[in-house]
């Protein structure tokens, strides 16, 4: 029997090809969202609607399974702790607290301070910040708000 290299190959010779690589994950931006413990929509919705090259990363802040002014205020330090758990070895470009009522109750300054504590260097925002900027851009003058909360 002939050595392996002397046998004719059953496979055609392949061409040498230069691989093409994409730009990598999150080449446009890495965005972090801080969610309530019981949140059920933001993470999947943001991942579904994110443009190509934008990575969506989420962490949940602990909170009682009842939304009230007291439970929202109580989660303040949990916001920064949760932000620190998102990609701890990589810099986020943007970090967002994804709770409109929580941002109003806690206050944007305190929310942003917590986001900065957990994700220093990331641009901070919240859902209410986005809403206010959108209303300003639309020059909205009369606004009606409906919420599912009793207090």
Task: Walk through the language-model features, giving the residues of each.
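N-terminal glycine-rich anion-binding loop in soluble enzyme alpha/beta folds
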Residues: 2-81
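Residue-level preference for short coil/turn positions at secondary-structure junctions
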Residues: 27-29, 91, 120, 139
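Gly/Ser/Thr-rich loops at beta-strand to alpha-helix junctions
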Residues: 35-40, 99-107, 148-151
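Short glycine-enriched loops at secondary-structure junctions
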Residues: 39, 51, 100-102, 128-131
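Glycine/small-residue-rich loop that forms an oxyanion/phosphate-binding "nest" at active or ligand-binding sites
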Residues: 79-127
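Conserved beta-alpha
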Residues: 111-118, 122-151
